[in-house]
């Protein structure tokens, strides 16, 4: 398990405000207002990218809808539960508290954002090389 996943679970895994999603249920939907980031406490989920042309599987410790609690923008993709999932919601107020009181939280979020940036760049490069419009 990546160090960031373990860190997030250790910091937030005992959250009392757990949300349950059954397999097949949508966790966040593209275009929906981004009010929360969700920590995937248990289960697996799938992000549908580029209109479902590409998917990414997520597991315990992964963050879903990361920008939701940072700037409140609409979700950029749809995430669906593959198996039954437990999620811990992080709203903007809680995110601000975590950034302020747990600087290591901010460091790990930045690492996740960097990983996702490089993943997106690599995916775009592969699509361009294949002559596929995205």
Identify what each model region corresponds to.
Residues 1-134:
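Cytosolic regulatory regions built on CNB/CRP/Popeye-like sensor folds
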């Amino acid at each position: 398990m990546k160090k960031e996943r373990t860190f997030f679970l250790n910091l937030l895994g005992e959250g009392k405000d757990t949300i349950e999603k059954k397999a097949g249920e949508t966790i966040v939907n593209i275009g929906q207002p981004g009010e929360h980031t969700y920590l995937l406490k248990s289960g697996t989920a799938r992000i549908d990218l580029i209109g479902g042309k590409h998917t990414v599987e997520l597991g315990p410790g992964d963050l879903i809808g990361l920008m939701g609690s940072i700037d409140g923008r609409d979700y950029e993709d749809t995430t669906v539960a593959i198996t039954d999932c437990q999620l811990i919601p992080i709203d903007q107020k809680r995110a601000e508290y975590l950034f302020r009181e747990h600087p290591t939280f901010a460091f790990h979020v930045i690492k996740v954002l960097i990983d996702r940036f490089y993943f997106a760049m690599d995916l775009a490069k592969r699509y361009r090389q294949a002559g596929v419009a995205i």
